[in-house]
Each structure stands twice: as C-alpha cells, then as structure tokens.
C-alpha cells in the first residue's frame, strides 16, 4: 500500500501548488524576497518608513459559513471572507497590512474548488496591497469528509507605536460612525443553517417576495475596510477607536474598543436593517436579544471620532462607495441616558 492508496495524493498537491502560483505571486509586493515553494515566506519589513514599528497580527476563519458556501459552490467568495475576517481585525489598531498566510485542510484535494478559494484569497490580498506570502494545504482523509474543507488565515500588519489606535483617547460625546456591511458577512451561520433546515422552501419564498436570489444575498463576501481606513489615516483624520462588528454583533463588539467607564449610546433608528436580516428573523422566530447579539444587522465596522472629523469621514466613505452614517455617541456609564441604549439587549 502506498500513500496515495491511503488517501493522500502528493503529486496532485504539487500540481495544485503549480496552478496557484500565478494568483499568489500576483499579490507580491517589492518586500517579498522569494516566491512560493520555500519552507518559510520571507518578507522585508519596511522599517525605514516607521520611527518605532510595531507588528500587529490576527488570525481567524470563516466558521460554518463554509458548510453552506461549499454546498452552493461559493468558493471564490469564502477566500475573500478569510482575508476580510483577519484584515478587518488588525486594521482596528491602525495597522497597514503587510502579508497574509492561509491554511487549507481537506479530506480530498479538489483542485477546481480550492483553486477558486486561493484566487479569492489572492483577490482579497491584492485589492489591499497585502502579499499572500505562503500557506499550507493539508489533505487529511478520514479526518475531513471527501468534499469538505476548512480554512484559517493569518494576517500581519505594521504601525508606528505612537500612532497605535487603542481606544485610550475616547471621551464623552465622541461620535460613533457606522460603515455599512455587505450583508451577513461571516458570523451567525450556525443559526442561519438551522433556519434553512427548518424552512425547506426558504430560497423560493425570498425570491418571490424580494426578487433576489437568496443565496447570492446570504453568501456575499465580507467587506474589507482596509482601503477606506487607510485613506482616512493618510489624510490625518484622527480615529480614536475602531470596532470590527463580528460575532456578538454591535452590543458585544462596540464596547470592546473603549475604556470601561464609557459605553456606546446607539440610535437603533438611524439606519434601516437590511432585508436579509429581517427575513431570517421572521423565518427563524429569532428573539430580539439574539437577533442583535448574533448578526451585524447592516453595520460592518465602527469608528469613534471627534465631531470635527465627521464630514471628512463621510465624504471619504462616499468616494469609496461605502455607505456611512452617524450611529450614536459615547456616554459615561453613570449617565442617566444609559437606560436608553438597547435596554432589551444589554440588560
């Protein structure tokens, strides 16, 4: 018995690496020292551009969205999701992404599927001047089923220490600016899949009412906010804190980016919750608290700023074709207005 008979095809793995080479190397910046194929990716840190450079790292996956995306052949899109989930996290510190690494594990290597995944990852990196420096594709028969794969991503960025954004400058009456999400993004899919399981005609119902393809809406790739944030920082707009709205929604993620004696006061009527969320809530009979604590509800990213920067930020977002708006302000925890902030969710 040989290795191939046991379920691991080394030759197919070599062919796969050869086929993804063009997509991967297309993301490489001048700081990449060597191409793919070595044991470790080599990257020249651009320290001359920084006084006290700090590396910022993040790792994440796409969660159970993968299960649904694979069944509907949305492989390119989940590659973008993978980059977005990692990159959106590290830019909250003010970091500029440098390079990305991916890990793909599968029961049996399907080159057509995984080539689309890597092209999606490459697209996400390339659009944000981030080098796809390397990765690992593991064929694991018996551990994963034949047609399934899992993804993990790792992103590293850089920022000057004196320009780190950590929320320490947040103060009372600062404004909160919301940046619109691209839909459900990559969180809440265990609940979504259960709703679909319990409503076997859900896609047809959605299309009949809204004249949109249900899975096209549901599986849109996560928005990457790096370019618009980078433009703001380049134009010397002071951002005091940033929050990537992921699992836990606004109630869990927004308070994380500020000192504990402050809390976000959010006007929940300042935006229209997208139809995909309302539809899921109805079909799943989701309680209000779970609704807010599971989904982003149309808000993918938040900024905390002084009011003087509101108009410049809204204009930059408009130039980048991202909807943005003032969603609330910062109040002290002992402020009497706190009872008005999502009381049914936070209490």
UniProtKB/Swiss-Prot annotation:
EC number(s) given by UniProt: 6.3.3.1
Pathway(s) where this gene product acts: Purine metabolism; IMP biosynthesis via de novo pathway; 5-amino-1-(5-phospho-D-ribosyl)imidazole from N(2)-formyl-N(1)-(5-phospho-D-ribosyl)glycinamide: step 2/2
Primary subcellular site in the record, as a coarse category: cytoplasm
GO biological process: 'de novo' IMP biosynthetic process; adenine biosynthetic process
InterPro entries for the chain: PurM-like_C_dom (IPR010918), PurM-like_C_sf (IPR036676), PurM-like_N (IPR016188), PurM-like_N_sf (IPR036921), PurM_cligase (IPR004733)
Top-level taxon in the UniProt lineage: Bacteria
Alphabetical keyword list: ATP-binding, Cytoplasm, Ligase, Nucleotide-binding, Purine biosynthesis
Catalytic activity field: 2-formamido-N(1)-(5-O-phospho-beta-D-ribosyl)acetamidine + ATP = 5-amino-1-(5-phospho-beta-D-ribosyl)imidazole + ADP + phosphate + H(+)
GO MF annotation list: ATP binding; phosphoribosylamine-glycine ligase activity; phosphoribosylformylglycinamidine cyclo-ligase activity
Protein location: Cytoplasm
Broad enzyme group: ligase
Protein's UniProt keywords contain Transferase: no
GO cellular component: cytosol
Record family assignment: Belongs to the AIR synthase family.
Protein name in the entry: Phosphoribosylformylglycinamidine cyclo-ligase
Organism whose genome encodes this protein: Prochlorococcus marinus (strain AS9601)
Name of the gene: purM
């Amino acid at each position: 018995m040989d290795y191939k008979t046991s379920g691991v095809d080394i030759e197919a793995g070599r062919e796969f690496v050869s086929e993804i080479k063009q997509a991967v190397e297309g993301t490489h910046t001048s700081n990449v020292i060597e191409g793919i194929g070595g044991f470790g990716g080599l990257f020249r840190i651009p320290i001359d551009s920084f006084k006290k450079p700090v590396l910022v790292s993040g790792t994440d996956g796409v969660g159970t969205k993968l299960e649904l995306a694979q069944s509907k052949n949305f492989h390119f899109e989940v590659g973008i999701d993978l980059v977005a989930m990692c990159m959106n996290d590290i830019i909250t510190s003010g970091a500029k992404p440098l390079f990305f690494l991916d890990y793909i594990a599968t029961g049996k290597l399907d080159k057509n599927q995984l080539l689309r995944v890597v092209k999606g990852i490459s697209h996400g990196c390339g659009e944000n001047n981030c080098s796809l420096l390397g990765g690992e594709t593991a064929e694991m028969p018996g551990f994963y089923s034949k047609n399934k794969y899992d993804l993990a991503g790792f992103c590293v960025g850089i920022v000057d220490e004196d320009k780190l954004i950590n929320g320490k400058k947040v103060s009372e009456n600062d404004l909160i600016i919301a940046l619109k999400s691209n839909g459900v993004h990559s969180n809440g899919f265990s609940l979504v899949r259960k709703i679909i399981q319990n409503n076997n005609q859900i896609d047809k119902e959605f299309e009949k009412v809204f004249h949109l393809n249900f899975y096209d809406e549901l599986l849109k790739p996560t928005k990457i906010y790096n370019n618009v944030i980078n433009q703001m920082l380049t134009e010397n707009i002071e951002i005091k804190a940033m929050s990537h709205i992921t699992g836990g929604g606004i109630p869990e993620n927004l308070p994380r980016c500020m000192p504990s004696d402050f809390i976000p006061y959010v006007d929940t009527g300042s935006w229209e919750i997208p139809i995909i969320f309302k539809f899921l809530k109805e079909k799943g009979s989701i309680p209000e608290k779970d609704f807010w604590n599971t989904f982003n509800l149309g808000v993918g990213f938040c900024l905390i700023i002084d009011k003087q920067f509101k108009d410049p930020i809204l204009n930059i977002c408009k130039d980048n074709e991202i909807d943005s708006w003032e969603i609330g302000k910062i109040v002290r925890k002992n402020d009497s207005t706190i009872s008005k902030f999502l009381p049914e969710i936070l209490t």
